[in-house]
Amino acid sequence: MQAAGHPEPLDSRGSFSLPTMGANVSQDNGTGHNATFSEPLPFLYVLLPAVYSGICAVGLTGNTAVILVILRAPKMKTVTNVFILNLAVADGLFTLVLPVNIAEHLLQYWPFGELLCKLVLAVDHYNIFSSIYFLAVMSVDRYLVVLATVRSRHMPWRTYRGAKVASLCVWLGVTVLVLPFFSFAGVYSNELQVPSCGLSFPWPEQVWFKASRVYTLVLGFVLPVCTICVLYTDLLRRLRAVRLRSGAKALGKARRKVTVLVLVVLAVCLLCWTPFHLASVVALTTDLPQTPLVISMSYVITSLSYANSCLNPFLYAFLDDNFRKNFRSILRC
């Protein structure tokens, strides 16, 4: 399919497609400007597939382990673990399609057709939105739990079934957010008639490109992160103002561990994703020359966001005693 306007490359998180090895290449970098590369970047050709393969192997193994532990261990069927399960599913789905991205880098063209192109880009954006929104829901849950503990109140509405309904709502909401990217995704041919997978925007393509970046930045980062910050700021204010009763302290000890786990997972997520979204701000406000340094930094930032999909299982293993115990019991079976 010939793309309308200037398509954005497959690596839609903000990286630029690898230049063809060996000669001068002029290609669209996803910003609406053609970038000419006078020198190849052979180290990226070798390094990127190795990094992505490591993320894929570790992420797929780790997230599969998380899913199995939560589904098979009765003691792991808690409200918080419902959200962790869905987070693992989202990360696992992304690692499943990462080999396609690796193949595209190695082949230097897109051989898989338009349907798979749309699916890969959709899953990529599912990962962008679902990660932060499930963490936002987990933060809301922690806020309500700690607030109820402070006030020594029970929460009859906080049930395993309710967590499933909330997770379904997140998936439906994320699906709505991802639909525009699925619609604009397609296979196009660049100036060298090499098929590529990317986001194809109509005229004026520069306006559409900036709109897509603002859309992802605001709905995929600013809005949920601001919500999370407001919740935890209010929670800290309340905890300082209210002295816990003795009964609340007893209740809070076990829940404090879960709150710490959620906070650490959230912190790692922000560490991995903030550079990507800051890079989006740079892409929106400046016109950087596509030098080897800029291209390399772009891939580092993108790889960092990819890495978030394989880090969470290690956090659960280090911070959750129940997860470690149940994981060992499954290995013995």
UniProtKB/Swiss-Prot annotation:
Cytoplasmic side: 70-80, 141-165, 234-257, 308-333
Membrane-spanning intervals of the chain: 46-69, 81-105, 121-140, 166-185, 212-233, 258-282, 293-307
Subcellular location: Cell membrane
A biological-process GO annotation: G protein-coupled receptor signaling pathway
Highest taxon of source: Eukaryota
Matching Pfam families: 7tm_1 (PF00001)
Positions of disulphide bridges: C117-C197
Cross-referenced SUPFAM superfamilies: Family A G protein-coupled receptor-like
Tissues showing expression: Detected at high levels in caudate nucleus, hippocampus and amygdala; at moderate levels in the adult brain, thalamus, parietal cortex, pituitary gland, adrenal gland and lymph nodes.
GO cellular component: membrane; neuron projection; plasma membrane
Extracellular side: 1-45, 106-120, 186-211, 283-292
Membrane topology, as annotated: Multi-pass membrane protein
GO molecular function, one term: G protein-coupled opioid receptor activity
Keywords: Cell membrane, Disulfide bond, G-protein coupled receptor, Glycoprotein, Lipoprotein, Membrane, Palmitate, Receptor, Transducer, Transmembrane, Transmembrane helix
The keyword Nucleotidyltransferase is annotated on this UniProt entry: no
Residue positions with a glycan: N24, N29, N34
Family designation: Belongs to the G-protein coupled receptor 1 family.
Physiological role: Interacts specifically with a number of opioid ligands. Receptor for neuropeptides B and W, which may be involved in neuroendocrine system regulation, food intake and the organization of other signals.
Protein name: Neuropeptides B/W receptor type 2
Species assigned in the record: Homo sapiens
